[in-house]
């Protein structure tokens, strides 16, 4: 199947035109897309897709096992109300409400800098978000390239950061970013708290990237609170400089695939409530960070 690939930015990302994955895709094509995604620095948009939920899941599994798969762990209980009722592998993002009054998805999902599910021992690798209904204006998603941010640091700073570990904790976001009535207290236990290298290495190409984020990182292991906060705030400000960013303006049918191991993202919630928005996301379980 022929398709066209173009760069999204000078530094990272690719966009693909001319594919109709809903008409079927071979294992070879799916693996080619995985390879192209890795080569693009972990950010790829495939335009004009009409995938069913089942096809979305099938494609996502070529990237790895999914949260919600049989014999795999689900996402945290707090977001269970946003999981697709027929497909536990799909997390829904939406400002719409069903006829029974239940939300069709999370309205204000990801409106802060974060890396998906970084608080698990095996955090998210790829996230595959399919835009099914999109407002005419607004709702962009911004990505920050943490591999480029790491490379831009001085050798001295890299030497300081390389041996450090940081703690990631769902409670960091739950206490501020989620409406308190929907927090499930079970999510505050050890299953949603993990210690990871502050600088992680991708096994596919041995590239290094910063692996901390304001949404879920609580502190750096072994440092006092003031020291930890000073380093983290420096890294956060450094890593969202304009040269590391890509801002995606959504079109209906976009399938956006990003690598949580080397990218942070931020959802801009600037669209009106009366403009419907509905998206479905599959989230791939990654390796234990090293």
PLM regions and their residue ranges:
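Fe(II)/2-oxoglutarate oxygenase catalytic core
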Residues: 2-257, 261-290
